[in-house]
Amino acid sequence: MPGEEALGGSGDQIANFTSEQSLPIRWEGQFGLSTLNPQLTMAGRYLETYFTPKVLAAQQQYFGRSQNIPPQPERDALTEDENQFIQSRDSFYMATVSENGWPYVQHRGGRPGFLRVVSPTQLAFADYKGNRQMLSTGNLAGNDRVALFLMDYPQRTRLKILGHARIEDARKHPELVSQIAEPEAHSIVERVVLIEVISYDWNCPKYITPRYTAAEVQEAIAPLKERIAELEAQLRRQS
């Protein structure tokens, strides 16, 4: 099972915990999974979800034809590529939908791996104390659909994920908190967010501006700094 090492436990331990604590690894979501086309893989379902009649009409209007869903590899779960990409992110964006129909996008950040892959079709992350607005939490109480954007700016890579989310009270499930949160952060975890992935799609790199963290910049310029230090040492010896 992907993510077992990151979770610090075996797949059996995860399954037993969730079963005993009434936290199923899979659930049908508030709006159900039965509406999904069983003939399509996760990647195909992503396009099917968004290729609505209005979208197809817009494609026809501006490009002279509507797009078809291209053939997809036969895989209906997150693969090792997605697993590694997800668990190396230190941030992601999550969109929810409010009761009045307005979308809300929230930035989530943490150490690389804070978004856990707990099964081939499920993600989880700890929800810490914040500004108390409870926007995403409230939105999910009325509509469990979520859309995630995971960005790798240096490599200009983007993974998009759709799923159904549920929120569990951390106080009622300390064992789950211990599996997905850093030990020093257990006391500030208020909720655990579980996401059942229904589809995903990789984006092209066009228009993604490369951005780098301070650590990545330091790593890149380290050889230059070493060379500068060598040259300065040579100058001092010659003076």
Regions found by a protein language model. Give the residues of each.
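Charged/polar low-complexity intrinsically disordered segments
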Residues: E4-E5, D12-Q13, E28
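Binding-site signature for planar aromatic cofactors or substrates
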Residues: I25-W27, L33-S239
